């Protein structure tokens, strides 16, 4: 995974969302208007493995969490395709609920 700034689009059966992530030295940091995203990534062969958590920073009830809770930890596996990375995984708190994310690199 290239270091840099990514836009992220994520999907569950409950809805979709988006935000930004910055990848550097194995760390992921970012968020959107309602939540911060804090995690780590490693490369294992052709796959990228991610563990990332959400933390609500905006108490406005208009910002609804996709998983129904303000704090969640996701475990994801992904593959690169040029400037994009496709991830699939689940939340530790809801292991049966599929999660998909597409990261697209938008800058250094």
Identify the function of each model-found stretch.
Residues 24-28, 37-38:
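Short secondary-structure capping micro-motifs at structural edges
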Residues 1-14, 87-89:
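Tryptophan-anchored aromatic micro-motifs
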Residues 18, 43-45, 84-86, 91-108:
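Edge beta-strand at a domain terminus
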Residues 9-11, 53-55, 81, 104-106:
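Solvent-exposed residues in well-ordered beta-strands and their adjoining turns
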Residues 11-13, 31-36, 53-58, 90-96:
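Short, solvent-exposed aromatic-acidic interface loops
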Residues 14-25:
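Short, compositionally biased strand/turn segments
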Residues 34-84:
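Contiguous, well-ordered beta-strand patches that form the walls/edges
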Residues 8, 28-31, 48-52, 85-89:
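Short hydrophobic/aromatic-rich beta-strand segments that constitute the beta-sheet cores
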């Amino acid at each position: 995974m290239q270091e840099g700034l990514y836009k992220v689009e994520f999907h569950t059966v409950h809805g979709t969302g988006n935000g930004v992530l910055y990848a550097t030295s194995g760390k992921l940091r970012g968020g959107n208007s309602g939540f911060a995203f804090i995690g780590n990534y490693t490369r294992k062969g052709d796959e990228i493995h991610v563990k990332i958590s959400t933390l609500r920073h905006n108490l406005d009830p208009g910002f609804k969490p996709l998983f129904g809770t303000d704090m969640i930890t996701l475990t994801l596996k992904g593959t690169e395709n040029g400037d994009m990375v496709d991830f699939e995984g689940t939340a530790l708190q809801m292991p049966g609920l599929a999660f998909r994310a597409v990261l697209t690199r938008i800058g250094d």
